[in-house]
């Protein structure tokens, strides 16, 4: 539901490619849709109005740390793909959630072993996932702190405290919400110690204790990632007019190309969008060059 997408602006996601194809006479796939993921960190006082001011992108938002709502309650198995995690939080009161972790976060991130563009810990194979997907710098705890955590701490969007009680105050919980939050963390830590999430079924290796100071919390909402519909093309990646004939000399690939996603972005298939972009671009280039 894009109504609760907190971060909608991007200099790279303005639809120019699709517009240019339509101006040339191409046909747009029916049923527009977009993919929203859990990468927006929200400031105090954030409101879902027309402006939606103050949100920022936050790569660690996709880590499966403890999530609680504005009442301090855990409400989900946090080991979800991006849009499902966003949707779960968007359906909570005020349409966002808090993600909570402790001072052992780097060890926890290594244990989580997430893949794709949520990966923060260097991969043992030495692949491209060892680089931050946003600035291509080598991933490390120092980089995570310098590039992602410290600037948000300075901005006040990321909360940090020496005790859970103080953290709850920074999260603006009232007395009842604070008591619920502290009980939630205690319950969650018990599940971690037991090695089994009997509340929501999160796998044991994605459970992480919240017990070592300092403690952190971030208000997480949805960020617009990508359109998942686009221009209708033929097998050569040439856009089609409404009569089904191709527009010669024009090719549409990548996110501007339709007919690939059934109005759902399957983010549990790592690299699916990059893979289809490279594949259909190669097909288009070969056709343009007249080679088999």
Predicted regions and their residues:
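An anion/pyrophosphate-binding glycine-rich loop and adjacent beta-alpha core
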Residues: 18, 24-173
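Glycine-rich loop(s) and the adjacent beta-strand/alpha-helix scaffold that form part
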Residues: 1-44, 86, 268, 274-283
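Short beta-alpha connecting loops at secondary-structure transitions
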Residues: 2-6, 48-53, 149-152, 264-273
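Short Gly/Pro-enriched turn/cap motifs at secondary-structure boundaries
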Residues: 8-10, 53-59, 89-90, 220-223, ...
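Short, ordered coil/turn segments that flank beta-strands lining enzyme active or ligand-binding pockets
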Residues: 70-71, 235, 242, 279
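Glycine-rich phosphate/pyrophosphate-binding beta-alpha loops
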Residues: 37-41, 83-86, 222-226, 256-274
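A glycine-rich dinucleotide-binding beta-alpha-beta segment and adjacent secondary-structure elements
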Residues: 163-166, 170, 174-264
């Amino acid at each position: 539901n894009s109504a609760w997408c907190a971060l909608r602006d991007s200099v790279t996601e303005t639809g120019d490619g699709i517009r240019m194809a339509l101006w040339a006479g191409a046909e747009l796939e029916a049923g527009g849709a977009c993919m929203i993921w859990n990468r927006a960190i929200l400031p105090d006082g954030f409101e879902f109005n027309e402006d939606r001011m103050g949100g920022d992108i936050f790569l660690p938002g996709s880590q499966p740390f403890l999530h609680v709502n504005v009442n301090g309650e855990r409400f989900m198995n946090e080991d979800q793909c991006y849009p499902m995690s966003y949707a779960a939080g968007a359906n909570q009161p005020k349409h966002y959630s808090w993600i909570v972790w402790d001072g052992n976060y780097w060890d926890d991130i290594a244990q989580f072993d997430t893949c794709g563009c949520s990966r923060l810990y260097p991969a043992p194979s030495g692949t491209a996932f060892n680089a931050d997907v946003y600035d291509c710098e080598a991933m490390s705890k120092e980089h995570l702190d310098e590039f992602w955590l410290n600037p948000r701490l300075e901005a006040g969007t990321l909360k940090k405290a020496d005790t859970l009680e103080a953290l709850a105050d920074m999260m603006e919980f009232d007395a009842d919400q604070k008591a619920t939050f502290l009980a939630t963390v205690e319950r969650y830590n018990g599940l971690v110690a037991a090695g089994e999430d009997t509340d929501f079924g999160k796998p044991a290796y994605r459970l992480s204790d919240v017990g070592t100071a300092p403690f952190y919390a971030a208000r997480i909402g949805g960020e617009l990632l990508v359109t998942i519909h686009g221009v209708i093309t033929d097998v050569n990646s040439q856009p089609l007019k409404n009569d089904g004939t191709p527009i010669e000399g024009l090719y549409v690939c990548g996110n501007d190309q339709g007919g690939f996603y059934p109005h759902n972005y399957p983010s549990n298939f790592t690299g699916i969008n990059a893979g289809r972009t490279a594949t259909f671009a190669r097909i288009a280039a070969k056709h343009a060059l007249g080679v088999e």
